[in-house]
């Protein structure tokens, strides 16, 4: 949208038209001067109207198209915007939310007839968990926002929509040091595919997201420097697998590798070489650290099922693949590792994310520090 800056009695209007081939922002600007005697409030409104028309002129729009049905706007969004700007997995999830929940109710409605109260009524009619409703609303929000950007509609009706409140989630327990020791003993003693055991250990030792772990290639493992480079994520949608970028830019990181981890990777390499020798050229991805038995990308869902089966009937049956990441972070924080270091280690975009997720752990750690100081001063 155009930006408006007041300078004396005039208004400076700028419109961004994206970036050129050298990644330099393309900006068009103009100045609007209201006639003398115009009240400040009226001048601001006139400037906004002028900016709207100027932006439409810059982007080549000739007329609004608010008579279009919402399904037409959504079709444009999924054909032109989503494939270029969103990750393939996100596009899949957005399309699923649209086709299953939004299109049956709003698809045939003209865009000009969709207002804030109507959207509030729509989201409140969804008999789903609040977090699911919010995900559906995000799709609506994105479609309308792009519609405004492209000049199809004047404004988005998504402002001030009343959303259901998220229910407080029951926090899943994580392992303390004593439980971790018992868990590691269970891994060693209970019968299970050794390949799966190695993945579980890597997740627990590194705190990686499961998709990051399954996206590791042998080029990412540096035995000389004892480091692991995390540069990809294994996306998994509808049975299709592909490598993509990690969750955020800060998720691209390099972490240290302990000797225990190095030994696990060497075991995995030896195991994989045996598979390749048996299968030969039919082994699809010899460059990957963790694969299926025939060398295909490892399926996260089946891995989660294997973990669930492995832990069934034990004291650890509450653990999931992702909770191993939380266990890693909790162990680090309880060991006194600096919050910023833990945040970087986990690949969080912001230290505040780490502080928010592990607020209870940090509270406990602060209490331990206070007790330690008291003991020293006693």
Where in this protein do the model-derived segments appear?
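C-terminal catalytic core of Y-nucleophile DNA break-rejoin enzymes
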Residues: 28-39, 169, 225-229, 245-267, ...
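Short, basic (Lys/Arg/His-rich) helix/loop patches that form interaction surfaces
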Residues: 130, 185-196, 206, 255, ...
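N-terminal DNA-binding module of tyrosine recombinases/phage integrases
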Residues: 7-10, 17-112, 117, 268-285, ...
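N-terminal core-binding DNA-recognition domain of tyrosine site-specific recombinases/integrases
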Residues: 3, 17, 36-43, 66, ...
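Basic, Lys/Arg- and aromatic-enriched nucleic-acid-binding interface segment
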Residues: 130, 134-136, 149, 153-216, ...
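Catalytic-site neighborhood detector that most strongly recognizes the C-terminal catalytic loop/helix
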Residues: 174, 234, 346-371
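A short, basic/aromatic helix-end/turn motif that makes direct DNA contacts
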Residues: 215-221, 343-349, 359
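Conserved tyrosine-mediated DNA breakage-rejoining catalytic core shared by Y-recombinases
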Residues: 7, 12-14, 160, 179, ...
């Amino acid at each position: 949208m155009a930006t408006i800056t007041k300078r004396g009695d005039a208004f400076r209007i700028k419109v961004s038209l994206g970036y050129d081939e050298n990644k330099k922002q393309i900006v068009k600007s103009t100045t609007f001067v209201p006639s003398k005697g115009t009240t400040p409030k009226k001048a601001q409104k006139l400037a906004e109207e002028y900016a709207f028309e100027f932006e439409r002129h810059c982007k080549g729009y000739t007329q609004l198209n608010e008579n279009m049905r919402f399904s037409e706007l959504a079709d444009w969004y999924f054909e032109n915007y989503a494939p270029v700007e969103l990750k393939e997995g996100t596009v899949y999830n957005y399309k699923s939310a649209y086709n299953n929940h939004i299109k049956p109710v709003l698809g045939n409605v003209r865009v000009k007839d969709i207002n804030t109260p109507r959207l509030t009524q729509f989201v409140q009619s969804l008999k789903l968990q609040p977090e699911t409703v919010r995900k559906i609303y995000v799709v609506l929000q994105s479609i309308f926002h792009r519609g405004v950007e492209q000049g199809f509609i004047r404004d988005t009706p998504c402002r001030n929509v009343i959303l259901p409140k998220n229910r407080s989630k029951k926090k899943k327990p994580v392992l303390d040091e004593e439980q971790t020791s018992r868990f590691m003993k269970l891994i060693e003693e209970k019968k299970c595919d050794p390949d799966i055991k190695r993945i579980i250990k890597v997740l627990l030792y590194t705190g990686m997201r499961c998709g990051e772990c399954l996206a590791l290639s042998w080029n990412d493992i540096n035995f000389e420097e004892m480091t692991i480079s995390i540069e990809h994520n294994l996306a998994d949608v509808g049975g299709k697998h592909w490598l993509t970028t990690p969750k955020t830019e800060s998720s691209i990181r390099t972490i240290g590798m302990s000797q225990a981890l190095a030994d696990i990777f060497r075991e995995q390499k030896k195991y994989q070489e045996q598979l390749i020798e048996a299968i030969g050229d039919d082994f699809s991805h010899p460059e990957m650290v963790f694969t299926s038995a025939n060398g295909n990308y490892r399926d996260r869902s089946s891995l989660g099922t294997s973990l669930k089966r492995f832990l069934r009937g034990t004291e650890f049956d509450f653990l999931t693949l992702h909770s191993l990441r939380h266990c890693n972070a909790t162990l680090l924080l309880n060991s006194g590792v600096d919050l910023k270091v833990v945040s970087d280690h986990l690949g969080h975009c912001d230290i505040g994310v780490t502080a928010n997720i592990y607020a209870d752990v940090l509270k406990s750690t602060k209490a331990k520090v206070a007790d330690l100081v008291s003991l020293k001063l006693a």
